[in-house]
Amino acid sequence: MGLPLARLVAVCLVLALAKGLELQKEARSRNHVCSTWGDFHYKTFDGDVFRFPGLCDYNFASDCRDSYKEFAVHLKRGLDKAGGHSSIESVLITIKDDTIYLTHKLAVVNGAMVSTPHYSSGLLIEKNDAYTKVYSRAGLSLMWNREDALMVELDGRFQNHTCGLCGDFNGMQANNEFLSDGIRFSAIEFGNMQKINKPEVVCEDPEEVQEPESCSEHRAECERLLTSTAFEDCQARVPVELYVLACMHDRCQCPQGGACECSTLAEFSRQCSHAGGRPENWRTASLCPKKCPGNMVYLESGSPWLDTCSHLEVSSLCEEHYMDGCFCPEGTVYDDITGSGCIPVSQCHCKLHGHLYMPGQEITNDCEQCVCNAGRWMCKDLPCPETCALEGGSHITTFDGKKFTFHGDCYYVLTKTKYNDSYALLGELASCGSTDKQTCLKTVVLLTDNKKNVVAFKSGGSVLLNEMEVSLPHVAASFSIFKPSSYHIVVNTMFGLRLQIQLVPVMQLFVTLDQSAQGQVQGLCGNFNGLESDDFMTSGGMVEATGAGFANTWKAQSSCHDKLDWLDDPCPLNIESANYAEHWCSLLKRSETPFARCHLAVDPTEYYKRCKYDTCNCQNNEDCMCAALSSYARACAAKGVMLWGWRESVCNKDVHACPSSQIFMYNLTTCQQTCRSISEGDTHCLKGFAPVEGCGCPDHTFMDEKGRCVPLSKCSCYHHGLYLEAGDVILRQEERCICRNGRLQCTQVKLIGHTCLSPQILVDCNNLTALAIREPRPTSCQTLVARYYHTECISGCVCPDGLLDNGRGGCVVEDECPCIHNKQFYDSGKSIKLDCNNTCTCQKGRWECTRYACHSTCSIYGSGHYITFDGKHYDFDGHCSYVAVQDYCGQNSTGSFSIITENVPCGTTGVTCSKAIKIFIGGTELKLVDKHRVVKQLEEGHHVPFITREVGLYLVVEVSSGIIVIWDKKTTIFIKLDPSYKGNVCGLCGNFDDQTKNDFTTRDHMVVASELDFGNSWKEASTCPDVSHNPDPCSLNPHRRSWAEKQCSIIKSDVFLACHGKVDPTVFYDACVHDSCSCDTGGDCECFCSAVASYAQECTKAEACVFWRTPDLCPVFCDYYNPPDECEWHYEPCGNRSFETCRTLNGIHSNISVSYLEGCYPRCPEDRPIYDEDLKKCVSGDKCGCYIEDTRYPPGGSVPTDEICMSCTCTNTSEIICRPDEGKIINQTQDGIFCYWETCGSNGTVEKHFEICVSSTLSPTSMTSFTTTSTPISTTPISTTITTTSATATTTVPCCFWSDWINNNHPTSGNGGDRENFEHVCSAPENIECRAATDPKLDWTELGQKVQCNVSEGLICNNEDQYGTGQFELCYDYEIRVNCCFPMEYCLSTVSPTTSTPISSTPQPTSSPTTLPTTSPLTSSATSPTTSHITSTVSPTTSPTTSTTSPTTSPTTSTTSPTTSTTSPTPSPTTSTTSPTPSPTTSTTSPTPSPTTSTTSPTTSPITSPTTSTTSP
């Protein structure tokens, strides 16, 4: 049994070797790196190393495709003044339209010198102490040490498309670079061909020089350095011999005393780090020392992203290769705030608005008290009142910060107590211009003391208490009223309500409530519960989608008509008003105006938009403009920032119009001084309210009781505080009133003589002597909660006592009152479904809803538009990569995920779009870019399962931990989080705590007002420059505005009418115009279509399906997927919820449905009812296969398992069946003279065996012999002798290489197909393999298509040949690889050959695969080598094995005599002896420790050749 066992062990060792070489080859091909270093050494993408001492300008690496060239890298080397060491003088990089010129000190982009870091369109240039780096989204990264070393890494899509000193990147060493069409080039000849000839520049080519005869004296030292313990992790990753030879050459050429080996050692370290290794510090004080600034230390391998005081967690998210350089000592971070070097985290300062704060320093900011702790603010909330504002007659901001615009025409409940009628605040909105779209706040009504007292504040400045005018100040038991300036009235109450009423230039209201009222109020000002998301809570208890739908439910008079949302922008309707508005309103944003002092405290963006809106919409432009500017000044004063002098250049007519003896002041904080206050003493005067501006009495002066701050204009008519001149017209409900002879004469606009529908009755106020309803009582279902506020008789149809108006023209009892949601009526008892699993039921006009927690969504779309998880809309045009959301927040430094958005400019205006998304989950990185996903395994982190699938136009990534990312493959990303993440995330998407007011929480935990401060704090790398402003692309491209507004008007048009009541279109329309103006360098239609699609998607989620695409407007071509004469694929604007997929059949269900996504969906026929998302076709159930996480295994295919003695297979019922793999050998070891091995038993158990090791002696043959030992794999090098002999003379044996897989073409439709050839790889391959590109496990023969795969033409698949072969009758996507063979004399390495000095017997990693012979069954067979799988059938036999192989050593022509080889189980040097007499080879191996004697030639390059095995009976 000994001999068969020895053979078995030998075969297993060969298989292990072959597998290892295969993996190394694959690992190398993934690196895609070319480099140059030291004394003119170059390494190509394919792994060739050569020396070329050229000093001209050379093409280092370029895209050499004929159709379109994306990049080129040129370099120029020079010698130092002593003429010894060479260095790179300059690097010239061209990437698409950008040209970058680098020298030791400068970086020049497109002719302009730039500072680093430099960011532009898809380009980053940065410097550190050791390197200059260039990154491009085109798929290129470059690293230069500003001395002698340059490294370029390319994306895999450039394979077989490059030229230059870096070679053609085809995966074949030497081929096409040093060997082309049978002609061999030297390194000098190859290098000279890459010369860049410049006009008027003469540069001599280097000539061939005689290499030194021997550098072997340096081998031992170079091997010692490169195999030291510092490089222990590198030995299996990088071919050491290549760098040993380079090191030997460097030392040979080195002047006396020079440290010339440093460059090669450093390059070896860089290549090791790039391959995933971790070289340790090999430098010493005497060997290539390096110095670092400050207290930094030099490390050979560290994360290129330094943790800093402002970015504490970035190193854990770094996706780049480790590198050498200066780093902070362990336990410290770099202080990028004060620049004090490396410090402990506890000593990090904090930064706020440009000011530095020491650790432990406290500040009080608005409603927070914060302390600086380790570079982060630790804050706690303070009891803080909140303010609701009604500005400009239509703009409302709730207590919780929600902003909306509503043009009303009625009395509305602004705020009232939720559980009783102790107080209520009403506001009268009415038309004040020529149209009903210009509305003003006319009256504010305070009902207090359980509505026993009614206080009305008129826009003219008068105050009425229970319809009797009172003079100010006025003090009552529960409230007091004062007039601190000519512009303002202030009201203070005993129940925590404070009012600030602005009178000039238009009436505006600011309502403040103490924290004690939180959650106790309702009305247009919201419910004051800290959650902006439910501020549109109607009087019926349901959250509405739009402002008008919400406000209409809070009418205080049932006779008022519902108002619609006005979606038009008033500015385009009047160009003169628009220009006027832009000129003056832009003062709010300019940095040189007084308003700039407040930008950090109050973001001017929203005020600027309101200012333009009101100025364009107002009949008196200046008054509305000044009101808007004063609103911003008031907001600043409330934050403690006084805008002194802002009226000096604008809105100054009132400053100089103060009545005699009064002066204008910006910070009035006390009551007016009146003659009455002298006689009575205003001890009750309110003090300490927010500063107001206006005319007031100077110190030591008083106002008499007849004085007026605001002069009254001469009025012919007076009506409810409004003075009307003769001929003026006012619209009042359904009446048109004209001022004539000092009286209002009113005419019904709608005839009231019509018949009311029963049971309503007609009320004609002209036929009543009096109708006064002083006690509020409900008259409609909508005013049940708001209650009724009646000021005058209104003619029309009303319900009789005991019945309520149901809003649909009928009268019902209270129990039958319907409910309203999104402007639709629902009868009492009806239920509707909301969001995830919540339902609402209508009961007596109010909604009763369940409150289950749901997923929340963050949206990033277009050019920098964001909607946070809590619903906050904002814009941020950053130019770098930013944290969208992560759970590395607060003190949590061990988060589980991070999602990064990469922004690049999408035009010349400075606007950016999200072009790529990086998802870090556990130990995996997913990158969504260029319409596909790339998966990369990180070196740290645990495995987190995830699945990806295409749904319609979108790619969906679902992580098992409750994260869903939906990407439209362009610029739109939706991120959904499970409720378990609530309050535990941070980033540009906010903190997911249902409160929008703290969504702008920076990385250092401070809540800021500016979207710029917020966005800048979440940049991924601290080197990214801050954004100083958000550009307005329509102002920069005014010629595009009209086109953008015309195209985007579809969002406000009737096309989306069904959605307007469910999703507010205004913000999406603004975003659409913004994006359509910004995309001015191509893709403008794509920007527009993406913007409209974003609104359409929100409509679909709100169950408002809109068919908006047409053949002329953003069409989607689904028929592309249909085979000829079939119509299976269709466009679905709102997704498809009806079909089953193979994934659902396998039990893979999404945690949340995404079937609402628009796109192309199949309608599967009955015989193929299931959709296979991976194959993208309809199949029957038995064709689905099996799924493990995101990987599909076809029916009948093998399924991997962790059980080493089990083999698993996928059945046609999508089940995975596992069976014991009986007899499988799984492990072999040797301990002294004993050999141990393990096999699989019949029931899947592991059976152990051992015996005394017996060596094998293979009889000589007439062809070749193969001898191996059974030495332990893990501890002893494997000694293998492969010798070719001949009875007469030696023959030349070819050497062969398998190419990388080639997939240059992809299937086309129509009369096309798929073709792959081996052009530029080799002219006459020996063999070819073809397989499916999308599923490499499938051979081309398994796909059932009519395909040619041969060495004559490559692969040819024609669509016309596929009739009857499948549903689509289209070719699949294939890839090929070929086996290229060359005469032995051309297979020399491009490294200078070594001498016959003995080398270590430890097997060195090779740079291309080697195929060794296998033992075959008792038959004759010819086997072609592969690098992916080696299958061997082993049969016990005592017959000798005859095989023809090629040597793994360098080519020799010799006659070999019998050789005795003795191998010990311990590493020992090898002694080579060659005799010139021909005879067979006899090899004897024993397990005794002794030197090894073998016949071998010096190794110069790895060789693979075909193996033919013949076994005699």
UniProtKB/Swiss-Prot annotation:
Keyword Calcium: yes
Signal peptide stretch: 1-20
Entry GO terms, CC: extracellular matrix; extracellular space; inner mucus layer; mucus layer; outer mucus layer
Compartments in which it is found: Secreted
Record-listed Cu(2+) binding positions: 153, 274, 321
SUPFAM superfamilies: FnI-like domain, Serine protease inhibitors
Spans annotated as Disordered: 1392-1513
Pfam families documented for this protein: C8, Mucin2_WxxW, TIL, VWD, VWF
Domain VWFC, first and last residues per copy: 350-410
Entry binding sites for Ca(2+) 1: 46, 168, 170, 177
Positions annotated to bind Ca(2+) 4: 1306, 1309, 1313
InterPro entries the UniProt entry points to: Mucin_vWF_Thrombospondin_sf, Ser_inhib-like_sf, TIL_dom, VWF/SSPO/ZAN-like_Cys-rich_dom, VWF_dom, VWF_type-D, WxxW_domain
Entries under Gene3D superfamilies matching the protein: Laminin
Cystine pairs: 34-166, 56-203, 64-163, 215-252, 222-247, 234-272, 254-260, 262-288, 292-326, 309-348, 328-342, 350-372, 367-384, 370-379, 388-525, 410-560, 432-440, 571-616, 585-611, 598-636, 618-624, 626-651, 658-695, 671-685, 675-715, 697-709, 717-739, 737-746, 781-817, 799-811, 819-842, 836-854, 840-849, 858-989, 880-1024, 889-986, 906-913, 1034-1077, 1048-1072, 1059-1099, 1079-1087, 1089-1114, 1105-1134, 1118-1160, 1142-1184, 1164-1178, 1186-1210, 1205-1235, 1208-1218
A GO BP annotation: positive regulation of apoptotic process
PTM comment text: O-glycosylated. O-glycosylation is required for mucin assembly. Goblet cells synthesize two forms of mucin that differ in branched chain O-glycosylation and the site of production in the colon.
Positions annotated with a glycan in the UniProt record: 160, 420, 667, 767, 837, 892, 1136, 1151, 1212, 1227, 1243, 1264, 1267-1268, 1280, 1286, 1290, 1350
Record keywords: Autocatalytic cleavage, Calcium, Copper, Disulfide bond, Glycoprotein, Metal-binding, Repeat, Secreted, Signal
Major subcellular site: secreted
Residues that coordinate or bind Ca(2+) 5: 1303, 1314, 1316, 1373-1374
Taxonomic source organism: Rattus norvegicus (Rat)
Assembly and interaction partners: Homomultimer; disulfide-linked. The N- and C-terminus mediate their assembly into higher order structures to form filaments. The CTCK domains of two polypeptides associate in the endoplasmic reticulum to generate intermolecularly disulfide-bonded dimers. These dimers progress to the Golgi apparatus, which is a more acidic environment than the endoplasmic reticulum. Under acidic conditions, the N-termini form non-covalent intermolecular interactions that juxtapose assemblies of the third VWD domain (VWD3) from different CTCK-linked dimers.
Protein's recorded name: Mucin-2
Domain comment (free text): The CTCK domain mediates interchain disulfide bonds with another molecule of MUC2.
Function comment: Coats the epithelia of the intestines and other mucus membrane-containing organs to provide a protective, lubricating barrier against particles and infectious agents at mucosal surfaces. Major constituent of the colon mucus, which is mainly formed by large polymeric networks of MUC2 secreted by goblet cells that cover the exposed surfaces of intestine. MUC2 networks form hydrogels that guard the underlying epithelium from pathogens and other hazardous matter entering from the outside world, while permitting nutrient absorption and gas exchange.
Sequence repeats mapped onto the chain: 1392-1407, 1408-1423, 1424-1434, 1435-1445, 1446-1456, 1457-1467, 1468-1478, 1479-1489, 1490-1500, 1501-1511, 1512-1513
